[in-house]
Amino acid sequence: MCQNENCNCKKPYYITTAIAYTSGKPHIGNTYEIVLADSIARFKREQGYDVRFQTGTDEHGQKIELKAEAAGVTPKQFVDDVAGQIKTIWDLMNTSYDKFIRTTDADHEAQVQKIFKKLYDHGDIYKGYYEGLYCTPCESFFTESQLVDGKCPDCGREVQPAKEEAYFFRMSKYADRLIAYINEHPEFIQPVSRKNEMMNNFLLPGLQDLCVSRTSFTWGIPVTFDPKHVTYVWLDALTNYITGLGYDCDGNNGELFEKYWPADLHLIGKDIIRFHTIYWPIFLMALGLPLPKQVFGHPWLLQGDGKMSKSKGNVLYADTLVDFFGVDAVRYFVLHEMPFENDGVISWELMVERMNSDLANILGNLVNRTISMSNKYFGGEVRNGGVSDAVDEDLKNVVLASVKKAEGKMNELRVADAITEIFNIFRRCNKYIDETMPWALAKDEAQKDRLATVLYNLVEAITIGASLLESFMPDTSKKILAQLHAQKRALSEMDQFGLYPSGEHVTDAPEILFARMDLKEVMEKVEAMRAAEKAAQPAAEEAKEEEPVIDIEPKAEIEYEDFAKLQFQVGEIIACEAVKKSKKLLCSQVKIGSQVKQIVSGIKAHYSPEEMVGKKVMVVVNLKPAKLAGVLSEGMLLCAEDADGNLSLMVPEKKMPSGAEIC
C-alpha cells in the first residue's frame, strides 16, 4: 500500500468469499455468498477503491476422495468437473471476481507445504495421536461435550469414533493473544452476535490443540517431511487468502500480497465463522502476519423453513432460477431477501411476487412510462423547462438522501437495506408521476415547459437510481441508462441533481425490462420440471457403468431340510443403543409380529442407533440365544458386505408388515 499521503492512487480493498467445497453443484444458498460479495466489490469500486476480489474452490479431503471413488473417477478428475460447474455458475451470475483460486493449484500446494514445515520448525506444530469423534462431511473432530444431541454441532450428522497418528497445532499458545485482539478490535467479527458466540462458546472455555494432518485418506497435500500425512483441510483451505496474492513464507512475497494484505473483508457463511475467527487468525499470528480487518458471517438463505440441502429435497439451483427469471432478477431476489443478521427465506411464490411488484411494476413500468411519455409529448427530447414546483424539491431531496443512505448501508454491509434505499428512489418517482399528472399537463399548451421539467426530473432521478443500481443489477442498470441515452453517473457526482444533458433524446423503442409473471403458470412449469427430474433418475441409474461383482469362497452344499430349519421374518426396529463394552456392537429391540426380540449386531461402524430406529429389516428369528459382549442376542439381522467391508442391512423392497415371512 502506498504510504505517500499526497499520492492520488486508489486505496486498496481486498474482499474474499469462502472457497466453495467441490463435493457437488452449488445451490442458490451457496450462490448467494458470491453475489453478495460481488455487490460489495462493485460498490467499493464505485467508491474509488482499488478492489481485489477473490473466490475459488476447496478441493481436498476425505469426502471428495469417497465421492470420486463412488463416481469411478480420480479425485482430480472429480474436482476438475465440479470446479468447472462452480465457475460456470459464478460467471452466469455476472460476478466480477479478479482471482479464482483452486487449492489444487501447484503454487498453492507448494506454499501450504512450506507453511506447514515453517510452523513445525517453530514448534507450533507437533506430532501426536488423535482419538475423538469425527464428522466426515465437515471433516472435523469433536469432543463428546461439543456434540449437540450426540451429533455434529455444525451439520447435525452422525459422528464416528476415530483414532490416528496426527500433527497438532498449539492453539492454546495463542488463545490469550487472540482474545485480547478481539476485545481491542470490536469490528473484527461481525455481526456482534457471532463475536459473542465465538468468545463464549470456544475462546473463554479454553482452546484445544487442533489436528492439522490426516493419515486415513490420501487426497490432500502431503506433509513433505512425513508424506504418509496429508495436510488437514483448514490449514490447506484457509491459506488460500494469502497464497492467492502470492504470499511466500520464505519472504519472497509477490506485489499483490504487499499491496492488498491484510484483507479488508472475509465474507463467509455463519456456519464456518469459527474457523475464520479462531483458527485462521491464530495461524496468521504464528506466521507473523497481520490479521484480516473484518470477518463477516452472513446468515443462510433458506428454502421454505429450512437450510437447503440435497438430502432434504429442497434445493434450488441458480441456473434453474435464471432460466425462469433472468440473472438480474435472481440477483435481486437473493440480495433483497437476506437480512443483515437473521436467515432469509426464498420461495417460488415470493420470487414471482417480487418479480411482479418490485421489478416489473415499481422499476420496469416506471422506466417504460417515462420514456413513452417523453416520446409522446416531445418526440423523445428531454429538456429542463425551468418551471419548478415544491414537489420537485421533495423529489430531489428524496433522491439525494437515498443515495447517502444507500452508501451508509453499504459501509455497514447492510446490502438488503441499501437496495431498499435505491428502490425508494423509484417509488418516489412513481409517486411524483401521480402528483404531477403529466397527461393532464399535456392537455394545456401553457404547461408545456412545466411538463418538460417534470419529465426531465424523472429522467434525472431514474439516471441516478439506475447508476446506483449497477452494483446489484449490473445488466439492468446498463439497459436503463442505454434507453435513457444517459451516461452512468459516478457516485461522487450523486450529490448533485440536474446533470442529465438538457436536449438529449431517449430511445424511441423502449424495451420491457421485466415482464409480469403468472404464479399458476410458473408453478405448473416447476411441477413439470420436478416430474421430469424424477423420471430421469431411474434412467440415470440404468446408464451407470456395470457395478463390480464379488466372488466368495463357496461353502459346502446343504440339503433343503437343513435350510428349512431357518425361520426368516420381517422385523421393525423400535429401539436401538450402542453396547457400552464394545466398539462394534449395537443392541436393537426388534418387533416381529406380536413379539419383540433383542438382537445384537456388529454394525456400529456402519449405522448409528438413531438411523436404525424405524427400519424394516430381514431377521433370522430362530437362532439359539447367545451373549455377545455380555448382552443377550435372540436372532440375527441379515446384511450384505462389499469388498471393502462396508455393510448394508437387507430390507424389503416393498412395504411389508412386521412379522411377514421371508420365503
Ranges and model annotations:
Residues 541-663:
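Phosphate-backbone binding interfaces of nucleic-acid-interacting proteins
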Residues 2-55, 107-111, 161-376, 418-422:
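Structured secondary-structure scaffolds
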Residues 2-82, 101-116, 121, 138, ...:
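N-terminal catalytic cores of NTP/NDP-binding nucleotidyl/phosphoryl-transfer enzymes
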Residues 93-102, 120-133, 145-146, 160-163, ...:
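Short secondary-structure capping/junction motifs at helix and strand boundaries
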Residues 477-562:
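Intrinsic disorder at enzyme termini
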